[in-house]
Amino acid sequence: RNTTMQNVKKLSRTAAAFLLAALILICSTVLPNTGTTVSAASAELTSIGLAEHALKAYRDGWQYSYGAYGNFNSNGVRASDCSGLIYSYFCWVDDNSNIQPNWNYPRTVTAQANDAVESGPIDTIPRTHGLIVTIANYDHVGVYVGNGMVVDNSTWGVNMRYESIPGHGWLQWHKL
């Protein structure tokens, strides 16, 4: 009789765990009262999204072109300058389309740094992916992607880089 009761309790716990898991799954994929799925909601701009965008640009081999912001060049490769890499995140359409400019977002390094909600010296950088980092006089900008690493689109012939924070003379971090 004890064995039967133990089996019933075990079955009840298993059923309760299954129902709880199903409820969590349902709640995590549909936002309340909107019917919007999480994947659609993730289109919102986030610091993590900016870091992922920069890493994708690095992996895809974007080329450097002064004044460009992520559109395809004549070779079919995306191109940007340093601030254009960040600006392209704000205006992204999809992997196969050119960027659609939205001048409500900051385009230049100075505008991006001035638009920050928080800033500090590089030696105080929080462990927050997607911060932007700048050098002296806001002459260059990159994206902090975690683990002490920055992605930036550097200059002609160098293109995208993935390097440690001390590697380029970064002086400040900024949270957009």
Where do the protein language model's features map onto the residues?
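Bacterial N-terminal signal peptides that target proteins for export
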Residues: N7-L19
